[in-house]
């Protein structure tokens, strides 16, 4: 009889967790997204970009899927075009071409390069993203395990 009561309690605890799972999964992805966003902001700060105002770092926002099944860090939505946050982030990430001079016959360009190298802060962040996600998932699983133990 004692075993049956304990089994019923375990079953009820599991049922409660399964009912809360979609919300908990969204919570996990929000945690992972915030952690990856912090890592990306550190990569931007250490990349050498002159971002003393923090504008480029502020542009990077966490997006959670509508069903809560994924998290992405990307430039904020807004205006489109060559001077939008997404375009500027892309130029900084991957580099960009410098337009050739179109001046008069005596014009001498200050720069003598045809391409500006990128800072690759998204690439550097993606190398650490998996370990960040694993760490957050382990902490999330530990919280669920503690809740299960407490309910028994």
Pin down the residues of each PLM region.
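Short, Lys/Arg-rich flexible segments
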Residues: 1-74, 102-152
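Mid-chain, well-packed structural core segment of small domains
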Residues: 70-101
């Amino acid at each position: 009889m004692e075993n049956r009561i304990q089994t019923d309690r375990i079953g009820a605890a599991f049922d409660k967790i399964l009912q809360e799972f979609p919300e908990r999964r969204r919570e996990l992805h929000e945690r992972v997204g915030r952690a990856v966003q912090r890592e990306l902001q550190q990569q931007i700060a250490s990349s050498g970009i002159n971002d003393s105002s923090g504008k480029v770092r502020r542009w990077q926002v966490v997006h959670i899927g509508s069903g809560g099944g994924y998290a992405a860090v990307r430039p904020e939505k807004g205006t489109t075009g060559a001077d939008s946050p997404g375009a500027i982030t892309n130029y900084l990430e991957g580099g960009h071409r410098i337009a050739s001079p179109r001046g008069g016959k005596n014009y001498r360009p200050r720069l003598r390069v045809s391409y500006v190298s990128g800072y690759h802060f998204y690439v550097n962040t993606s190398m650490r993203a998996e370990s960040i996600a694993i760490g957050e998932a382990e902490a999330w699983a530990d919280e669920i395990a503690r809740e299960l133990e407490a309910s028994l």
